[in-house]
């Protein structure tokens, strides 16, 4: 599986083409839209999410509700484009019109792609950078992840995500799967403990009042993965490495870990390695899951646990110092409409990015043209864990 996204933040639409999805997989736009809706929620989101009502249109690769095995094209319309038509139009404009263009950006924002992107592509109006580097692109990636999740669900592989920290406020509780599934989306900061949730809201409110932003940590879990997906024989075939690359490619993500993550550096090996056990019903399993479901870059049958670190959003209503690229004079950075905290939404994005990487690895590991063929191969791999 692979995909390509296109579109600007305030352009007409986002488009994504997904290749490699097996044939005969049932897909409905409404199922994708449920995932899109989750991305738009979360405490701390800005006014943009009050304008956009993300709904996908599937324009190729699906017929009568089932995939054909050909590339799937999905379109997400940007409703806000109606307010930006003159600024983000496709047609050429005169030099005079360009000089008088509203919303031109020459004061780059610290922590964003503005300045370096302008240097790389020789853009004097940094809006040309901002529009594509915006996290609006993650709407397309959630659509890809939603298709991936539909595929994984057919293979009895399940995805979940949650927030574990916002601005230093942590929810480190351990919850059983059923409690997690029933409660996580009832909360606008995507944590289980309501007392902790309120502390997080208070932290977000304080940052917003101060014109600031805050980041946090999210966690993604993948349940019921077959064993030995990924490979140790080459660096680029290790599944945890691929997931790590996918996670840090999300806007504002600065770190990734698995299982206990960086805490593993504080403990002796005897407390970190997961002991191997065997049961006649389920086969090989581990007595713990400190390593987050991976050994040697391969799945070991335990739940995959991925932790992603998101920095505070760089657009601030109390802007930091910057320099105008034309005059070279000191200025406060440009203010662009933004969120004060996008960590809850980022947990949804991270879940869908991981879903794609897992689905991609599955379809590479088990070469299948249609979903029934893929299911049979997955069942065979699961038997291997018992019979080996």
Curated annotation (Swiss-Prot):
Residues that, per the record, bind NADP(+): 39, 45
Organism this protein belongs to: Staphylococcus haemolyticus (strain JCSC1435)
Pathway membership, UniProt: Metabolic intermediate biosynthesis; chorismate biosynthesis; chorismate from D-erythrose 4-phosphate and phosphoenolpyruvate: step 7/7
One GO molecular-function entry: FMN binding
Designated name of the protein: Chorismate synthase
Entry's Gene Ontology BP terms: amino acid biosynthetic process; aromatic amino acid family biosynthetic process; chorismate biosynthetic process
Pfam annotation, one family: Chorismate_synt
Residues spanning the membrane: none
Cofactor: FMNH2
Manner of cofactor binding, per the entry note: Reduced FMN (FMNH(2)).
């Amino acid at each position: 599986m692979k995909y390509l996204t296109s579109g600007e933040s305030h352009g007409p639409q986002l488009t994504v083409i997904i290749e490699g999805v097996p044939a005969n997989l049932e897909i409905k736009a409404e199922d994708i839209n449920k995932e899109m809706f989750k991305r738009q929620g979360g405490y701390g989101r800005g006014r943009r999410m009050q304008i956009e009502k993300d709904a996908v249109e599937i324009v190729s690769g699906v017929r009568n509700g089932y995939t054909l095995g050909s590339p799937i094209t999905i379109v997400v319309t940007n409703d806000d484009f109606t307010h930006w038509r003159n600024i983000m139009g496709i047609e050429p404009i005169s030099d005079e019109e360009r000089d008088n263009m509203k919303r031109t950006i020459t004061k780059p924002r610290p922590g964003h792609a503005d300045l370096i992107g302008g240097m790389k592509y020789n853009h004097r109006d940094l809006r040309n950078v901002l529009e594509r580097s915006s996290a609006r692109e993650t709407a397309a990636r959630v659509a890809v992840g939603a298709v991936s999740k539909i595929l994984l669900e057919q293979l009895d592989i399940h995805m979940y995500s949650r927030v574990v920290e916002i601005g230093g406020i942590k929810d480190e509780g351990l919850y059983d799967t059923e409690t997690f599934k029933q409660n996580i989306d009832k909360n606008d900061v995507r944590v289980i403990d309501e007392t902790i949730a309120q502390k997080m809201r208070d932290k977000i409110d304080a940052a917003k009042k101060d014109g600031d932003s805050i980041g946090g940590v999210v966690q993604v879990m993948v349940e019921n993965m077959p064993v030995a997906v990924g490979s140790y024989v080459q660096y680029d075939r290790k599944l945890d490495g691929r997931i790590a690359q996918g996670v840090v490619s999300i806007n504002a993500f600065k770190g990734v870990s698995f299982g206990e993550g960086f805490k593993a550096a504080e403990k002796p090996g005897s407390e970190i390695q997961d002991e191997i056990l065997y049961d006649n019903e389920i086969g090989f399993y581990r007595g713990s899951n400190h390593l987050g479901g991976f050994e040697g870059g391969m799945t070991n049958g335990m739940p995959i646990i991925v932790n992603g670190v998101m920095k505070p959003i760089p657009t601030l209503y109390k802007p930091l110092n910057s320099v105008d690229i034309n005059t070279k004079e000191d200025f406060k950075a440009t203010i662009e409409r933004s969120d004060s905290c996008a960590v809850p939404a980022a947990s949804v994005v991270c879940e869908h990015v991981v879903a794609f990487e897992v689905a991609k690895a599955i379809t590479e590991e088990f070469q299948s043209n249609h979903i029934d063929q893929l299911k049979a191969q997955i069942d065979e791999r699961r038997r291997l864990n018992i019979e080996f």
